Swiss-Prot record:
The gene is infB. Residues 48-63, 121-181, 210-261 have a biased composition (Basic and acidic residues). This is Translation initiation factor IF-2. Residues 48-86, 100-381 are annotated as: Disordered. Residues 105-114, 182-202, 304-326 have a biased composition (Low complexity).
Amino acid sequence: MASNNVAQFAAELKMPAGVLLEQLQAAGVQKASEDDALSETDKARLLDHLRKSHGATDGDKRKITLTRKHTSEIKQSDATGKARTIQVEVRKKRTFVKRDDVAEGADQGQAQVAEADDDAELKRREEEARREAELLEKQAQELRERQERLEREEAERRAREEAAEAERRRAEEEAATKRAAAEVAAAQQQAAAQQAAAEQEATPTQSAQDEARAAAERAAQREAAKKAEDAAREAADKARAEQEEISKRRAAAEAEARAIREMMNTPRKAVVKAVEPPKPVEPPKPAEAKGTLHKPAKPEGAQARPAVKKPAGAAAPATTQAPAGAGDRNKKPGAGKGGWQDDAAKRRGIKTRGDSSGGVDRGWRGGPKGRGRHQDSSTFQAPTEPIVREVHVPETVSVADLAHKMSIKASEVIKVMMKMGQMVTINQVLDQETAMIIVEELGHRAVAAKLDDPEALLVEGESGTDAEQLPRPPVVTVMGHVDHGKTSLLDHIRRAKVAAGEAGGITQHIGAYHVDTPRGVITFLDTPGHEAFTAMRARGAKATDIVVLVVAADDGVMPQTKEAIAHAKAGGVPIVVAINKIDKPEANPDRVKQELVAEGVVPEEYGGDSPFVPVSAKTGAGIDDLLENVLLQAEVLELKAPVEAPAKGIVIEAKLDKGKGPVATILVQSGTLNRGDIVLAGTAYGRVRAMLDENGKPTKEAGPSIPVEIQGLSEVPGAGEEVIVLPDERKAREIALFRQGKFRDVKLAKQQAAKLESMLEQMGEGEVQNLPLIIKADVQGSQEALVQSLLKLSTDEVRVQIVHSAVGGISENDVNLATASKAVIIGFNTRADAQARKLAEANGIDIRYYNIIYDAVDEVKAAMSGMLAPEKREVITGMVEVRQVFKVPKIGTVAGCMVTDGIVKRSSSVRVLRNNVVIFTGELESLKRFKDDVKEVKQGFECGMSVKNFNDVTEGDQFEVFEVTEVARTL
């Protein structure tokens, strides 16, 4: 943004406009308000003024440095006596200073400093004075509180001492009294003893005893008084020492407060100093300041840095003041701008490696020549608090990106990985779990990032369409049972012959056509009626506006008719009933109406909302009435869609053409589809390379409710997928790949679940026979219908396993897959190429071709029936009654029998019955008639029989003779 006035320039510099106006006036640029124009010359004058006020010199060179380099060689012997040549390089450096310019610059600097004492400086000083006053008031308040606290403590201490002293005195008095009483008692006892011993002496001795007793009492009193006096003196000395300690502490606190007040009340140094002769050596030129315009003018004395610690005796007197602009490093802290506040601010600065002061206060290499060589700044830097970041970790992230998210070097991440026992490079990709562990290890907080859902763009795009809604043609789906005449009816409407060219006379693909009638355009969807094409009918009902339900007048309501009614009701679509084949003699429209009423489709003449139209696809009777009713329903629905908008639609059918690649039949539902648009259909995307109508003629655009066939997709889309036009091919590819990843994850999860389920079933039920199949069909809908129909044939003993199903011809890859999985290849309306046929013959792979879905289902059903285990059935061939029992040595028991029913064969099994209870089941060991072995004995003849491993035969037993036969099972 160009700064043409004062306000804009202040906004660019991020400073108040009032401060900028004051600086402009100080620089000699007369600007009265913020709206005044500001030229480049004015900015240059302001910059020049601020540079000079900050101590910078003008651009003229007043100093020149000459460097001379001299190289020489010397020869010197080493320890071994070998002479070596050493290169010696001598560098000499000399600086010449123009003294007059230095003095003149100093005078000008002093004058400019005097001019710089403007309102901004006064305001700043007033603000500092106010802050100092607040600080002094706060410190004084703290001092008063501290003194009050000390006085309270002193009073409490005195009270405690007085109480302790009184207690001590009382105890001493009691002790002295006790001691005196004891001494008196002892003296009395002694006196009594003496009196008892000297009773016999003369009377003058009694007076001497009284005198001795009085002397003892006086001595005891003197001793007690002396002890009490010593105790009182000790207590007084102790109290005096404590009082002196308290006085010292109070004096120290008062001295500290007084020192703080004196420091804060000390007047600041005058900005304009007395003119002193300049020093012969020019001070070092400070580093060029960036952002000079952001700082107000300050006196030259503020250029000095805070003093550093120096050895004892090396410090200059505190009252000595350096000349202006001399940059004296020995100046007392607080003498320059900010003082100790600046020092604290520096400690809060960014922590860097090495010297960040430009060498001014560092060693002898940096700073002014020959000054303070042994001085070093030992400024303490407070430790910085570690920064804990919230790192969003995606599913995969490289080492470099992860380090960037944590604002550290990639080498730190690599170190942590090495400690964890994993060697990585900077470009190696890590998974989400590992990356989160590393983030936590480095002290940050890891958050699993949400997946970027590209499909959110589609929702935003849908909400942003505000195109004008215009009327569109209705989409009519023709549904009904197989062979009820749906396609023939459409052929008569379109004047075409589609039904005649279909295999088996049945529709196996969903077709889309649009018809121009005198009252408007109608788009028809022709759906198959076979039970296998349930998904096709569901898609037709989903994409339609009106359903035409075709019912044969001679056949009535059939299972697929009921299914079509259910699809229409689920989609909330109005139904128009066409009672077909009324030209047949056995037609009974009234019975059809009654059956449809039972299914919930009530005709208008019965008070319902579904028009019933009797038609004949053969003669064309009633077709005009049918179209009239369809268009009437469309007018009631008021169908509208945006035309000038990106196209949206649905995939009706899709296939893989050998020359064209993936081909999809699309019904445009809204907007206009143009050739060259970028389309997205499920997991497929691409640019529309070619667009054909239902007659195979090229077209450039397709509006709402128009079916077209497009080419140029990346793969065959799924039938029923939504089609949308996107402005960017990159975004379409991103969404398609995202959907492919989701589909792959779901597919793998389903496969894993299926594997586990099948494993558990096999463990519980034993081995199950599998019939592996590879299915290749011409279009997506037929492939889907065939797969679903074959999977329904699975039983508990034989299961259909679809190894692979796809759209297109049979290739070598399919044959190789069949070889590996021992599968049968089924081609529905497709053929194998020459290489695939040769490979199949070489490997013995069975390839079956079908063009009618009935035939494919029936043959697979027959193959599964052959895989079923045969059923074993018992057939009773005869009954034998035991008449007599013979015991034959070395043979065992032989029963003489009469065949009462049927026939007895030598190879038959036998069941022994006694009183109609089975006691043994086994095989015949021998069958004889008159000592001859025979193969069979018929009813009414006698024979001899022996049963293997059974000798407990008695008269009256019965032998039930039977055979076990195997019967083939069917599904």
